[in-house]
Amino acid sequence: MATIDDVAKAAGVSTSTVSYVLSGKRPISAPTRARVERAIDKLGYRPHAGARALASSRTNVIALMAPLRVGVSVPVIMQFVAGVVTRARDFNHDVLLLTQDDVSGLDRVTGGSMVDALVMMDIEADDPRVPVAAAAKQPTVLIGLPQDPEGLSCVDLDFDAAGRLAVRHLVKAGHTDIALIGSPPEVLRRHTAFAERLMRGLRDQAKISGVTVKVEACDSTPTGASEAVDTLLATAPETTGIIVHNEGALPHVLARLAERGAVVGTDMSVVAVCPTDVALSQRIPMTSIDLPAEDIGKVAVDMVMARLESEQPSETRLLAPVLTERESSADGPAGPLD
């Protein structure tokens, strides 16, 4: 059976262009439309019922696209899922969980009458799913912030502000040599939006504060964490303040620092960006910037249901980061600033 990808390839256009031809939501030039329609006829492509006009009856189902890609923290993903599922039940809706990231799967779900609305996670800076979702008739809310949301509403932690807040905290404590042990290389190669936004905020604040910041990508494994710590201490041995933005690697980073003789909370200050339960489950309670994953999931459902009930302009909600100081904080060589 032909898919939207097959049509796009045959017509020499993007999948989003095919979606726009089907939905009529955006103007497409006559020659391009003709090529797409010829490809549809030649391949016998038939979208699921309702692709051109969503059935008026409700399915009481929300699709949640939460791709289980390499490098993601599944426990944290499940906190987002829990928030979406719990809040959806308040609206008498069930949740269809999609763990693949292919555009064809998105087209299959939005092209028919399977779901009333869609929530999408793990958003990349230039995410190929965004234009397809934007062309769909169902309302969609993104958990994440791409470079161009294309009219879709977004909700997330303000990771840019979180990066700035973490640096300000360490600078105020007297640290001038700071490092980020960040997301896995695969996450960075995909240009995942949350990781890039945190690094941007961190670097901007470091420049403003006049301090140095070294960034180390880190696999979420004991070996990956050990290699990141060893590389950091070899190339920047003067580092006294570390920000960890990698839930899976966090316990292994702390273990390797201990093996290397660094006492966290005394001669090394560590700030984690993670859910509070992750911060509290480490060998010592971690100073952390909370990632309120479950709350973000609930807000996403509130937003998408509001758009399902009535026409509303798109919006972006970025939750302000909150830092809680615990036992992993320590004063830096310069001493705390007044």
Language-model region placement:
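Hinge/beta->alpha junction and helix N-cap segments in small-molecule ligand-binding domains
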Residues: 67-75, 100-103, 155-165, 181-228, ...
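Glycine-rich phosphate-binding loop signature in dinucleotide/nucleotide-binding domains
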Residues: 43, 173-175, 232-238
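Short beta-strand segments enriched in small/hydrophobic residues
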Residues: 17-20, 57-70, 177-187
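Short acidic/polar active-site loop segments enriched in Thr and Asp
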Residues: 14, 60, 116, 176-177, ...
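Alpha-helical recognition/docking segments in bacterial nutrient-uptake
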Residues: 2, 61-168, 234
